[in-house]
């Protein structure tokens, strides 16, 4: 039981940090999110609420709702990161108006961009959900 709570709690903390980081970049640093950033937000923000409730109730059944959202979010993050870093992918135009998806507001150590941070968060959530091993809540 304790391991389940630890993995749920860790997933919730990751989602919460990702959401707060996203809000920091847009509201404090005034970075305008592109279209793909919005899709990643749409998939990450509800995870804070879903995982928060599941954590405090000790409900591991939430895995079946969280995993699809995290996997889709990871794929969007990968596509976004490739568009930023690989010249061949920059021809893909998912962003039709506003801020270009190929723009890089941050580029820490030459490879850490905002989509990369989102990808790490989604991957950590996927790993923690997989470590729940399908245990049922009582």
UniProtKB/Swiss-Prot annotation:
Alphabetical UniProt keywords: Cell membrane, Chaperone, Competence, Disulfide bond, Electron transport, Membrane, Oxidoreductase, Redox-active center, Transmembrane, Transmembrane helix, Transport
Membrane-spanning intervals of the chain: 5-24, 39-58, 65-82, 110-132
Gene Ontology MF, one: protein-disulfide reductase activity
Keyword hit for Membrane: yes
Gene ablation phenotype (knockout): Cells partially restore cytochrome c oxidase activity in a CcdA-deficient mutant, possibly because the bacteria can no longer oxidize the two heme-binding thiol groups in apocytochrome c.
InterPro entries referenced in this protein's UniProt entry, alphabetically: DiS_bond_form_DsbB/BdbC (IPR003752), Disulphide_bond_form_BdbC (IPR012187), DsbB-like_sf (IPR023380)
Chief subcellular location: membrane
GO CC aspect terms: membrane raft; plasma membrane
Record-annotated disulphide pairs: 34-37, 95-101
GO terms classed as biological process: establishment of competence for transformation; protein folding
Membrane disposition: Multi-pass membrane protein
Cellular compartments annotated: Cell membrane; Membrane raft
Entry annotated with the keyword Disulfide bond: yes
Pfam families linked: DsbB
HAMAP family assigned: BdbC
Family the entry assigns: Belongs to the DsbB family. BdbC subfamily.
Protein role: Required for the stabilization, possibly via formation of a disulfide bond, of the obligatory competence protein ComGC. Not normally required for production of the secreted lantibiotic sublancin 168, although it can partially substitute for BdbB when the latter is absent. It may also be required for the stability of other secreted proteins. Not required for sporulation.
Name of the protein in question: Disulfide bond formation protein C
Name of the coding gene: bdbC
């Amino acid at each position: 039981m304790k391991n389940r709570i630890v993995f749920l709690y860790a997933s919730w903390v990751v989602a919460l940090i990702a959401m707060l980081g996203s809000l920091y970049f847009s509201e404090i640093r005034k970075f305008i999110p592109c279209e793909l950033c919005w899709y990643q937000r749409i998939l990450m923000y509800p995870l804070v609420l879903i995982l928060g409730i599941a954590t405090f109730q000790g409900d591991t059944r939430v895995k079946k709702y969280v995993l699809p959202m995290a996997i889709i979010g990871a794929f969007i993050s990968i596509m976004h990161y490739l568009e930023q870093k690989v010249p061949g992918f920059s021809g893909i135009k998912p962003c039709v108006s506003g801020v270009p998806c190929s723009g890089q507001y941050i580029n820490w150590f030459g490879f850490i961009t905002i989509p990369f941070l989102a990808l790490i968060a989604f991957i950590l959530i996927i790993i923690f959900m997989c470590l729940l091993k399908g245990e049922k809540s009582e």
